[in-house]
Amino acid sequence: MTAKAFAEHPGQRREVYEDRSLWTRTVDETLRFEPTGPHVARYVIRDYECYDTTVPAGSAMLLFGAANRDPRRYKDPDTFNIRRDNISHVTFGKGVHYCLGANLARLEGRVALDELLNRWPEWGIDYDSLQLAPTSTVRGWERLRVVLA
């Protein structure tokens, strides 16, 4: 997802190329902006009031990653901005359901993208070939062709 975001925001890609200390912010902003797991199901353990509707205990509830684009939480939520003031997100969950692999995923993303920038500081995307992977859980690319400069 970051490769595509950087192709669409080359100025921010250049900022990271020049200042690698921006990696942590970049990875988290990408996870906020393009969550890999846009929805998750949970069972309600007790009756829950949600917008004047009671969700009974035992019900399944589907939660969406739209929280990452909530305008009450983020200024310009539909804008990719690695210098955003508050880049917290719910892509890895929260509380007891927080992803155990979150730190490893961040590290893998940083290492892969760091190497990509080292080898090819400029690139674009072949938009005609884009194809999301057909899965019901994790969001990612089946095909994302990068055009190297």
Show where each model-derived region lies.
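Cytochrome P450
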Residues: M1-A149
